[in-house]
UniProtKB/Swiss-Prot annotation:
PANTHER family: DEOXYRIBOSE-PHOSPHATE ALDOLASE
Function description: Catalyzes a reversible aldol reaction between acetaldehyde and D-glyceraldehyde 3-phosphate to generate 2-deoxy-D-ribose 5-phosphate.
Name this protein carries in UniProt: Deoxyribose-phosphate aldolase
Annotated EC: 4.1.2.4
Localization per record: Cytoplasm
One cellular-component annotation, GO: cytoplasm
Main subcellular location of this protein, as a coarse class: cytoplasm
Gene3D superfamilies from the UniProt entry: Aldolase class I
Lineage: Archaea, Thermoproteota, Thermoprotei, Thermoproteales, Thermoproteaceae
Amino acid sequence: MLHLVDFALLKPYLTVEEIVEGARKAERLGVAAYCVNPVYAAVVRPLLSRVKLCVVVDFPFGALPTAARASLASKLAEIAEELDVVAPIGLVKSRRWADVRRDLISVVGASGGRVVKVIVEEPYLTDEERYRLYDIVAESGAHFIKSSTGFAEEAYASRLGNPVHSTPERAAAIAKYIRERGYKLGVKMAGGIRTKEQARAIIEAIGFGEDPTRVRLGTSTPEALA
């Protein structure tokens, strides 16, 4: 199962030493990718050989202007194999779909062919918003729909009737939409995945097998899934 895991250390208070130790753990466990904030990309790069480097873009709010997001993605693509890009959540909630489309096409296009996972922040979305956003993610050329930053505000999510953590039901719904639309997208679930039982249930709910090009699980505690 670890070959499907993106080990993420993204808390703002983590030290350089903790990020370096995380890289060593990632290599030791043999996860799919080690995901860090942009400031640590150059530090982590030489520490990884069998594990891919993943860097987040405009995390966790998706609130930078498109030009800044695209420029950052372009620079990070010189270092990292994978980019986890937060969708422009405010534009999504404003239902400014043309702006969302322009943004994601620009950012993915600037990513130099690297694997791009677009974080749609499921806890904040209505069904209408999420399905429109999935369509735009597919159109942008991204490779994965990623469910959440793991930083979503529970009070707002609960107003919409959404959980803040990953669930098999949400994973199944994303995968079902991808299948029905014929999209070649993977599914990455993140947020609250802390046991092997949870992870297994989510993998089975997605139904894409155990192919790391189609399925990923984001967690800050990968040893719990070993």
